[in-house]
């Protein structure tokens, strides 16, 4: 069984991060979302419509859900970047003027220099090829954009660039985004909600704050947490009164400054500890 009793709802406009150990079912899950795989039981709904109620209309749903696989640049095949980005819109039966608009719009979203559109994609760097591949999906203007490790193999700068561009695309278009990633930092920085897969099931599905506040459970599932979360958990272990749900650097800085203000005002930053003998609280 690739997936077992998986049930969840994604609201329009959500940015959902999907995390899980290798073999947890992440990739299988996302290939069901545009009809590449058909569930053996259960149903998938998009806008309240059963994806497989009328199998002959599955192509229509595939245009609604854009899927970007890992290393999508390996799927490039056209003579020029322009033609590659235009491939999807052309298959949708759009006229040339609309195709041209979409190609340039998508290239702009991913930060691709217009001067590169008439170049062969195979002459470009790995990061630029990745942009062309992602733009080819964006040009179809899917209602739902699903990305499987879109920053895999890129250097830190390239990683930040492409994920920032996806986030900006999400903000400007209101497109629902599902991002599969092994990077807890990326999920913490870009997602609004997190779906945690474990052993083919959903282990958690909640806001970013609430999921990373359950760090011990994530660690028990063989997953990591953002480095900044580990630091704050260590501070709490040492008896320092700081929150446990810190998951981004800006939030960490804010919490540190607040703690400094409390200390400067004479407030104790020492967590109360439980006296095992008396069963009550004792100050360290």
How does the language model describe each region?
Residues 97-115:
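Conserved ABC ATPase "signature" region
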Residues 34:
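Helix-to-loop junction immediately C-terminal to a conserved catalytic motif
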Residues 145-148:
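Catalytic Walker B motif of ABC-type/P-loop ATPase nucleotide-binding domains
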């Amino acid at each position: 069984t690739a997936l077992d009793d998986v049930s969840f709802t994604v609201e329009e406009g959500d940015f959902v991060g999907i995390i899980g150990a290798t073999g947890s079912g992440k990739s299988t899950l996302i290939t069901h979302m545009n009809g590449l795989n058909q569930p053996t039981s259960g149903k998938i709904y998009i806008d309240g419509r059963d994806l497989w109620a009328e199998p002959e209309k599955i192509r229509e749903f595939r245009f609604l859900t854009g899927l970007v696989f890992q290393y999508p640049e390996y799927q490039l095949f056209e003579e020029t970047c322009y033609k590659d980005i235009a491939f999807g819109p052309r298959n949708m039966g759009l006229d040339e003027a609309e195709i041209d608009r979409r190609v340039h719009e998508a290239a702009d979203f991913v930060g691709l220099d217009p001067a590169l559109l008439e170049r062969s994609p195979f002459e470009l760097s790995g990061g630029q090829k990745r942009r062309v591949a992602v733009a080819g999906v964006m040009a179809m203007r899917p209602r739902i954009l699903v990305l499987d490790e879109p920053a895999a193999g890129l250097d830190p700068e390239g990683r930040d660039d492409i994920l920032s561009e996806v986030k900006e695309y999400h903000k400007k278009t209101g497109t629902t985004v599902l991002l599969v990633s092994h990077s807890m930092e990326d999920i913490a920085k870009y997602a609004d909600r997190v779906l945690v897969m474990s052993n083919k099931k959903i282990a958690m599905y909640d806001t970013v704050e609430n999921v990373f506040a359950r760090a011990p459970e994530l660690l028990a599932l063989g997953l990591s947490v953002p480095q900044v979360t580990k630091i704050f958990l260590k501070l709490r272990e040492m008896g320092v009164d700081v929150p446990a749900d810190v998951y981004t650097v800006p939030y960490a800085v804010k919490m540190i400054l607040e703690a400094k203000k409390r200390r400067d005002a004479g407030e104790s930053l020492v967590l109360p500890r439980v006296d095992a003998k008396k069963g009550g609280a004792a100050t360290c």
